[in-house]
Amino acid sequence: MSTFKSLSLSALLFIAFLFTCARGATFNIINNCPFTVWAAAVPGGGKRLDRGQNWIINPGAGTKGARVWARTGCNFDGAGRGKCQTGDCNGLLQCQAFGQPPNTLAEYALNQFNNLDFFDISLVDGFNVAMEFSPTSGGCTRGIKCTANINEQCPNELRAPGGCNNPCTVFKTDQYCCNSGNCGPTDYSRFFKTRCPDAYSYPKDDQTSTFTCPGGTNYKVVFCP
């Protein structure tokens, strides 16, 4: 029994040690667009950013399934209720849920396998503004960008007010949505991939689209880099 207690205590101390060593991150979200955006983050909320303004968020260690995006064409009242043309999150300035397509996404998970952060830019929900997602500390230097003018080049059938839809949003078929978990690239995903090779162009585009940095790295997300 004493041996079991010792092992249990050791396990708890080890878990506590790992938890103590894991550090969250600081994200500097910057608007370089020549127009106002309403930055959104889950977790984090939301903030209006005029050109040149920034917003700092501090997600905790172990945060996963998180994303940052820009909303455009928004109007909010004094209570923070309104609507956005792209990226709207249930009509709230302070987002509590993911945004409506089309919107360019910065996605991340902190302190995961081997205490690595995983991050990506995704066009699986379409595109609304150009984006950079880059580490700013920790000796990690590989940043990623999607800077093509996709809205102007968007195929007619994918066009939306203020953005360019992913085909899943428009056609809602397994070929494009990958509901079965078994799908490959399509002509539409190649359209996105050739213009933004660092970004996810369809749900299974993992091999060339997921990047890592050591846990505790800080990052910047730039709209219109």
Curated annotation (Swiss-Prot):
PROSITE patterns xref list: THAUMATIN_1, THAUMATIN_2
Keywords: Allergen, Antimicrobial, Disulfide bond, Fungicide, Glycoprotein, Pathogenesis-related protein, Plant defense, Secreted, Signal
Main location: secreted
SUPFAM superfamilies in alphabetical order: Osmotin, thaumatin-like protein
Family to which this protein belongs: Belongs to the thaumatin family.
Function: Has antifungal activity against B.cinerea, C.comatus, M.arachidicola, P.piricola, C.albicans and S.carlsbergensis. Inhibits HIV-1 reverse transcriptase.
Protein name per Swiss-Prot or TrEMBL: Thaumatin-like protein
